[in-house]
């Protein structure tokens, strides 16, 4: 047997046509300058709107502060009234508890001054339940 003859493929006569190897992407979107201008415009608009909102927020905050300042004397009067009522109840309870002790003066101040000294929470709530004292010192708590 004889060796087979290999036939090699050859290009067509005149050669192959030119190969287009360049990228042919369509132009789309905005140019770089227009995107930069759009970004700067967005930043300026955002800054302006934040300044406008901050002015409005400051105006509302001043209004809230003025309302609190107007209500503060009323709230302080209610707190003072509640404190004095609790002190009166404590004095009545003290008179009942210490009635058998000689030379005991009910309501005698431990401070040797004629000025008003605000009572401590322990002094106010000493004869009350633990829940009331915790509520006064820490606020309302579910776990107390």
From Swiss-Prot:
One of its GO terms (cellular component) is respiratory chain complex I. Pfam families: GRIM-19. It is a single-pass membrane protein. It is found in: Mitochondrion inner membrane; Nucleus. The chain crosses the membrane at residues 30-51. Keywords: Electron transport, Membrane, Mitochondrion, Mitochondrion inner membrane, Nucleus, Respiratory chain, Transmembrane, Transmembrane helix, Transport. One of its GO terms (biological process) is negative regulation of DNA-templated transcription. Signal peptide: none annotated. Belongs to the complex I NDUFA13 subunit family. Accessory subunit of the mitochondrial membrane respiratory chain NADH dehydrogenase (Complex I), that is believed not to be involved in catalysis. Complex I functions in the transfer of electrons from NADH to the respiratory chain. The immediate electron acceptor for the enzyme is believed to be ubiquinone. Involved in the interferon/all-trans-retinoic acid (IFN/RA) induced cell death. This apoptotic activity is inhibited by interaction with viral IRF1. Prevents the transactivation of STAT3 target genes. Complex I is composed of 45 different subunits. Interacts with CARD15, but not with CARD4. Interacts with STAT3, but not with STAT1, STAT2 and STAT5A. Interacts with OLFM4. This is NADH dehydrogenase [ubiquinone] 1 alpha subcomplex subunit 13. It comes from Pongo pygmaeus. The lineage of its organism: Eukaryota, Metazoa, Chordata, Craniata, Vertebrata. The gene is NDUFA13.
